[in-house]
């Protein structure tokens, strides 16, 4: 009887252990499944978060691209100032990663992001209090700050020194440049109409317009046409020749201005190349090639004349 009792107890103990073992195994399996589901859910949420962030980043960049495209080649109007400011504010709000995503018909990260020098070194010469005599320097313009201050600004300063009794002011013919500089650097440069209106409002009597254009091309023609609309607003209006002077009757005619420019740039090229003279460069087998922007305008004949020179 005692042996049967011991055997029965042993059987019960083993059965209990087996049941307990099965229960532990089932619990572990359930816990593992729950953990896997949690990890999978977290991965899905993380992926969705990344994708959502990427969409948000691109949307922010696309918005800035739209604002840049709106002002890029825009003719100045009543909304230009506000739109330039809005585009810059939106750009400044982007992260560095978002800025790299900016892309539009004309827009890219360089529109606001490219370093072209210190804009504060450039004087837009758009002040009032002009007086009766104004010398208006008209250039196509450049959005490169250092070049604008040194090259265009250098010409303007030289004219100020040469004609102290005249007020020197600036105008650009390229609205695309004006908009870019204003949006990026908050520097406002007059276009030709703005500059002429400023002259009228300030009571200018004698106006001399000095273009920095190279030749009698489309920009020069448009400048002259614009001036015709204001000729009765001043007592005298004088328009200076572009750097290469008047257009001759044919490609063999080389006027004095073209000859001087040809000699000047050749001398500078020889000096930059380290030669004492053009003959020395020739003896050394060195040739100089001068490249121009080119134009479909009839003024392209100037290039042929230089070749004759």
Language-model segments: which ranges?
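Extended amphipathic ligand-handling, pore-lining, and cofactor/metal-binding catalytic surfaces
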Residues: 108-309
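Residue-level recognition of short, structured coil/turn motifs
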Residues: 19, 96, 164-165
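Post-signal peptide N-terminal segment of mature Sec-exported envelope proteins
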Residues: 30-56
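Hydrophobic core
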Residues: 10-18
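Bacterial lipoprotein signal-peptidase II cleavage site
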Residues: 20-32
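Bacterial Sec-dependent N-terminal signal peptides
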Residues: 1-9
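Beta-rich interaction/scaffold domains
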Residues: 51-115
